[in-house]
């Protein structure tokens, strides 16, 4: 036999080792003894050490890489990793199936049913059959790059089997820690003095986020694939079960417990069987996932917010424990909501120490009759959020009295009130309440809002308590001097230490001024008296002398970075800005819908509440909340202050033409929610007058003569008798006319510059997000699609564009860089 040269031998060893991995981890059919596997692995490792050029990224030797020097970089998921809605009862599952059958017209649709592993969701990206990147789910849109750690998992193939895989393949699945392996690891950890893992799920998540892949490699992690993300169009699927079969063929482990079942009966029977064997499984599961098998049906059902309508997680009953309520305190949120929180004697529930639970509202406390000193049953709903489910009244201590909502806010002393019919009590102090200001600022700077990196909760609390920041606009006036003063005082554990540290930055009369400030707030500089409890806050509130900061004696980089981050946030998108304002009921999805529909902050802040119902999926309650927010002079002043301090919306655009159908008189009458005015009656009334103010002039007799039924006619005339309603109608009509004037006229709609064009975006844009770019392009008539084909009009390519750019070149698709995109958008804005 002719000896193989090193390159041939290395290739042969890689092939045999990868084949062995596939049979061992996927098929559970070992082909070679462990000793033979180890021998081949050592031989390949030696070859690659001798000939470094022979090492390849997919080599079995690369499963343990080099230590990562810094924290993980962010990865933006091409296809979002959606969360699932939960079902906690049989009726919820029946309702889930009913919605699908009603929409699709099938009596017993097929579902893929599988255990919901209690691990960490990840996305694996393969290009030309080679594993190139792995990321955590993160927030569903952006995750962390954990490629090096995922290479250490023997159950994740580095190179795909077969040759039927697509050019680009994203595989979605769960990294988990088998329970026997978890227990064995903890046994060894105790013997060696290592930190033991709290539970398998935390063990999996923590292991995957180690900065050193060698540590990850020591942890007993496994992987199951359950779906796909981005896939190039050279492979087509019709059913989810086909996807799972292909994943198995390509080398991915897929749960052997996955079954194809039919109708609600099939789902519930599967759930019962899995519930019975749950404790015998070698891994933790917290429920069952049901997915509609037919992919065309999935497309028809669509999505709601961040979850698909064609899938649901049927959760098992959570684990429960008993503990004692030590106190009931009130927490004030950013909207003033006063939420009672029970402080508990610490207890372990499903592997997590629970010390407090939210009691939601006063009605919930009254329903459960929770009292201080009670023994309560605590469970983790969905194995995530702790909650009190019952009180053991037989164990109630003598003298325990029923709890009632305090009349005053524990933070600012303002009255706590509840609107008629509402479940939530609120502090009436609004932004005069420091707790609400703190929460409002925390929300404003959060990553998915204005994204001010480096401004943490503790810093926000100090800025508000020290009266440096009174509202979000004050952030844009923060100076280096203010931040360094904050750090100097908070780092000083005693007044004496503050004076000692201050000598590096101030001398003479100014140092004496600082001493006088300390005396003024009650500090005895002799060191004999007691130090006031809040002396640091009182000192920060005082009028300080000027400091000459010695940058060698105090860290300044953090403050400079924070000021730079605040400055960067001045350029933002409309959806981020609206979300950052913290309006009640306005989450990211609603903010995005508002931005897409109206396009301009100047428009949105002037609209009366009924016009917000023109936006898809916004109902009366949400519309009223937005309108109420915008009607408050203090909120309008806050927006003015932000604009005055340089905050600019970078993606403003005209209102979308789809609003036109919502701006008819009949639609306006519907949006006003006048009693007895049904959609059919609104259409009839719209024929009687061209505008709302003119319709208001019609008396009861005129309406009756026009054929309007008595109940509707009387309701309308009574509604218009209110001066407030007349004012609302006039304002509504005026804003409607303004919006209509800014829309493209019907005869010009087809002349939108990108009408009928198909556009793909790839890579990272520096000036605006891809979502903002997509919104701008859609407003100009473009259709945004996810993959490049011969029908693509042009591709917008930012930094790190990936395979879409290669495909665009191959298909001779026109390619725009960011400069060309911005020039085009600016040209249209100018027109």
Swiss-Prot record:
Kindly state which keywords UniProt assigns to this record, in alphabetical order.
DNA damage, DNA repair, DNA replication, Ligase, Magnesium, Manganese, Metal-binding, NAD, Zinc
**A GO biological-process term:** DNA repair
Identify the residues that bind NAD(+).
34-38, 83-84, 114, 137, 174, 291, 315
EC number annotated for this UniProt entry: 6.5.1.2
Keyword set includes Ligase: yes
The answer to keyword DNA damage applying to this record is: yes
* Function summary: DNA ligase that catalyzes the formation of phosphodiester linkages between 5'-phosphoryl and 3'-hydroxyl groups in double-stranded DNA using NAD as a coenzyme and as the energy source for the reaction. It is essential for DNA replication and repair of damaged DNA.
Query: Protein name, please?
Result: DNA ligase
The species this protein belongs to is Xylella fastidiosa (strain Temecula1 / ATCC 700964)
Upper taxonomic lineage: Bacteria, Pseudomonadati, Pseudomonadota, Gammaproteobacteria, Lysobacterales
As recorded in Swiss-Prot or TrEMBL, the protein's gene is named ligA
